């Protein structure tokens, strides 16, 4: 499946619906819609769509937001925002 129709849908949202919102609501940079368009362009409909969905799910008050660009390469595991701290788990070769 080509990503072009999905990118057009995102651009339509940006032109028509987004300006009608009373205030900017995205906590990330680039915005979730721009991230979606970039992810679809870079990674195609399936992988780019997955990245876009994962980003929208993270755009909520429980996540601090910030700068989160589209990864250059599709991650093997779920994407984590760049610059986010690593988990608190100690290395496996050391006792906890």
Curated annotation (Swiss-Prot):
Subcellular location(s) per record: Cell membrane
The protein here is known as Putative membrane protein insertion efficiency factor
Task: State what this protein does.
Answer: Could be involved in insertion of integral membrane proteins into the membrane.
- UniProt region (Disordered), positions on chain: 68-96
Per the record, its GO cellular-component terms are: plasma membrane
UniProt feature, compositional bias: Pro residues: 82-96
Topology relative to the membrane, per the entry? Peripheral membrane protein
| Matching Pfam families | YidD
Keywords attached to this entry? Cell membrane, Membrane
Main location group:
membrane
Q: What family, per the record?
A: Belongs to the UPF0161 family.
């Amino acid at each position: 499946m080509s990503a072009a129709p999905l990118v057009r849908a995102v651009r339509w949202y940006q032109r028509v619906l987004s300006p009608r919102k009373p205030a900017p609501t995205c906590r990330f940079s680039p915005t979730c819609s721009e991230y979606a368009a970039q992810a679809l362009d870079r990674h195609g409909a399936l992988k780019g769509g997955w990245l876009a969905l994962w980003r929208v799910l993270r755009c909520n008050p429980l996540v601090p937001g910030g700068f989160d660009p589209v990864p250059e390469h599709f991650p093997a595991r779920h994407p984590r925002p760049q610059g986010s701290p690593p988990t608190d788990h100690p290395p496996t070769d050391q006792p906890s």
